[in-house]
Swiss-Prot record:
SUPFAM superfamilies: MFS general substrate transporter. It is found in: Cell inner membrane. GO terms for molecular function: transmembrane transporter activity. It is a multi-pass membrane protein. The chain crosses the membrane at residues 11-31, 51-71, 78-98, 101-121, 134-154, 162-182, 206-226, 245-265, 273-293, 297-317, 332-352, 361-381. Keywords: Cell inner membrane, Cell membrane, Membrane, Transmembrane, Transmembrane helix. It comes from the Bacteria. The keyword Transmembrane helix applies. This is Protein TsgA. Pfam families: MFS_1 (PF07690). HAMAP family: MFS_TsgA (MF_01044). GO terms for cellular component: plasma membrane.
Length: 393
């Protein structure tokens, strides 16, 4: 593979994460305006965004098999067509059914693109370099999560219709579409070059189960925590502005942490540092949940920084459980994480209703403790060390 081709594929991976981050995180900014547009209360409007999450989940799950049937370049180009149709649907429709359909299509497109982006990184880079590259790729999710809400605020403050926010997000996919030209993608399944040697099917092993549970619990814990921090902070007498600043600080620190760990991870065994980070994150979340408002700002900054590398390292270790990176395995771990996203309000909503926001934060803390236990147990069964040794010879 030529260096320029590798750079193009790497940028497609970066932008695939930026696309998903923009779509998921911008929701809170535009929900009120969309509710006004359809003359609906915000509470019933929020349910339609489940179609976005459902699209992401279904496409990540199915793409484990689709990748071996439909070439990656074809998928990305077809995704561009779907993106144009979805944004056009948002712009020219006043029907809630069509809005929900467009949201589902956007979810499908971003899920397919993100799973391709993840697979490209696991295919092109080996060992510890794979971990640091995946981490840097994941930082584009957070970066888009910071940039696009600012773009949305700028447009909405000038009374520009909400659907132009999605048109701006569509520009990310225009860049991906342009990068597919003159770019060679890895061939999979029936499109892969034929070899005389029989294809050896590798068993995944119990380590994949530990990593999948860790991925689900981590995302469910993280989103369950950050979704209820503002309500919890307001209950302690903080202003809405200060409560919002806590969330912003978390994501800012999370992004800085990703950049720092994309360098730091190269010097450590991934399973060991993952266990340390998961334990630290569980302790820091407990400090936040039981501390005074005066210490909240510092503890959430520390939590954002030290938890930033956990999810990506889980995916990296998953990809290293087999000798050759398996798209089905990587997508399975990703799917478990996405299920965590889907369950966020299903799990935390009733807890808050019965016991208040702090109970939801303590539940999230318990989930982080489960992540620590899974990472610790992984140390006894993980195959990443033997596969790293093989690839380094």
């Amino acid at each position: 593979m030529t260096n320029s081709n590798r750079i193009k594929l790497t940028w497609i991976s970066f932008l695939s994460y930026a696309l998903t981050g923009a779509l998921v995180i911008v929701t809170g900014m535009v929900m009120g305006n969309i509710a006004d547009y359809f003359n609906l209360p915000v509470s019933s409007m929020s349910n339609t965004f489940t179609f976005l999450n459902a699209g992401i989940l279904i496409s990540i799950f199915l793409n484990a098999w689709l990748m071996e049937i439909v070439p990656l370049k074809t998928q990305l180009r077809f995704g561009f067509l779907l993106m144009v149709l979805a944004v056009a649907g948002l712009m020219f429709s006043h029907s809630l059914a069509l809005f929900s359909t467009a949201m589902f299509i956007l979810g499908v497109v971003s899920g397919i693109t993100m799973s391709i982006g993840t697979f490209l990184i696991t295919q092109m880079y080996e060992g510890r370099q794979r971990g640091s590259r995946l981490l840097f790729t994941d930082s584009f999710f957070s970066m888009a999560g910071m940039i696009f809400p600012m773009i949305a605020a700028f447009l909405l403050a000038r009374s520009i219709e909400w659907y132009w926010v999605y048109a701006c997000i569509g520009l990310v996919y225009v860049a991906i579409f342009i990068l597919t030209f003159g770019c060679e993608f890895p061939a999979l399944g029936k499109h892969a070059p034929k070899t005389d040697a029989p294809v050896e099917k590798e068993k995944w092993g119990i380590g994949v189960l530990f990593l999948s549970v860790a991925a689900l619990c981590y995302i469910l814990g993280q989103l369950g925590f950050i979704s209820w921090v503002p309500e919890y902070a307001k209950g302690l007498g903080m202003s809405l502005n200060d409560a919002g600043t806590l969330v912003s600080n978390f994501w800012m620190s999370y992004m800085v942490g990703m950049w720092a760990f994309s360098f730091i991870l190269r010097f450590f065994d991934l399973q060991r540092i993952l266990t340390v980070l998961a334990g630290l994150a569980a302790i820091l979340m407990y400090v936040f949940n039981t501390g005074t408002p005066a210490h909240m700002a510092w503890s959430i900054l520390a939590l954002g920084f030290f938890s930033s590398a956990i999810y990506t390292t889980i995916i990296t270790l998953g990809s290293q459980q087999t000798k050759v990176p398996s798209p089905k395995l990587v997508n399975f771990v990703l799917t478990c994480g996405t299920i965590g996203t889907m369950l966020t309000f299903v799990v935390t909503g009733p807890i808050v209703e019965h016991s208040g926001p702090q109970a939801a934060l303590l539940t999230a803390n318990g989930l982080y403790a489960v992540v620590f236990v899974m990472c610790f147990l992984l140390g006894f069964v993980s195959r990443h060390r033997q596969h790293n040794t093989l690839t380094s010879h």
